[in-house]
Amino acid sequence: MSDILNKIIATKREEVAAARLAKPLAIVEAEAIAQPAPRDFVGAIRNKIANDRPAVIAEIKKASPSKGIIRPDFQPADIARSYEQHGAACLSVLTDRQYFQGCPEYLQSARAACALPVLRKDFMVDAYQVAEARAMGADAILLIAAALTLEEMQALETQASAYGMAVLVEVHNGEELDAALQLKTPLLGINNRNLRTFAVTLETTLGLLSRIPAGRIVVTESGILKPEEVALMRTNKVNAFLVGEAFMRVPEPGAELARLFA
């Protein structure tokens, strides 16, 4: 596959420029400030781990650039309730329209249907999107190290923190990890999927663990499909997981969560 990440980021910058014209940043910021306090995303993950349970960030995703439509019958509220009933710590909801067929309304619908903290899963490149995330009710945002400079990540993290939102910073290699470790967030996502080629290997997480200092919560992302893979990660003291596609492809996502993380 071609370098899809660069393509997505270019599209995202165009979308933000158009959004700023349609609704000025000051209006979005006012909407963000008017929201009720965010739910505690980091706390929800820590609580699971403290109780010796895997902390699952369960994803709600209709489609992807590499797989096309993943879940034709897509009901975010029903999926959110199913995840909550079966032990998820948090939700991750795709809001990117063009490549993942997501939207802010999916996040709002999912969040309203449960009490779980919700991550806005999107490609954040601009302060506008952070304000937008809080305005739509998100409790956390994702920062992808492959798409941002350290200075950009620090600025977006500072803004998210001012709104009370958590930050999950995502890396795929050592260079990205070095940058991510300069942020304040305890949440460090290691994506086993290379966003430039979409190839997946769990060795990505395992290979970076020795470089991560104590106090960080490692979230392994992508490629967790079997209970043995969960066990492998937990043996290596990785107790937080972001899983989406494995759940989206079955009729009852929450039941699959319970089976995978039994």
UniProtKB/Swiss-Prot annotation:
Keywords: Amino-acid biosynthesis, Aromatic amino acid biosynthesis, Decarboxylase, Lyase, Tryptophan biosynthesis. The keyword Amino-acid biosynthesis applies. SUPFAM superfamilies: Ribulose-phoshate binding barrel. It comes from the Bacteria. Belongs to the TrpC family. It comes from Dechloromonas aromatica (strain RCB). This is Indole-3-glycerol phosphate synthase. One of its GO terms (biological process) is L-tryptophan biosynthetic process. Its EC number is 4.1.1.48. One of its GO terms (molecular function) is phosphoribosylanthranilate isomerase activity. Pathway: Amino-acid biosynthesis; L-tryptophan biosynthesis; L-tryptophan from chorismate: step 4/5. CDD domains: IGPS. It catalyses: 1-(2-carboxyphenylamino)-1-deoxy-D-ribulose 5-phosphate + H(+) = (1S,2R)-1-C-(indol-3-yl)glycerol 3-phosphate + CO2 + H2O. The keyword Amino-acid biosynthesis applies. InterPro entries: Aldolase_TIM, Indole-3-glycerol_P_synth, Indole-3-glycerol_P_synth_dom, Indole-3-GlycerolPSynthase_CS, RibuloseP-bd_barrel.
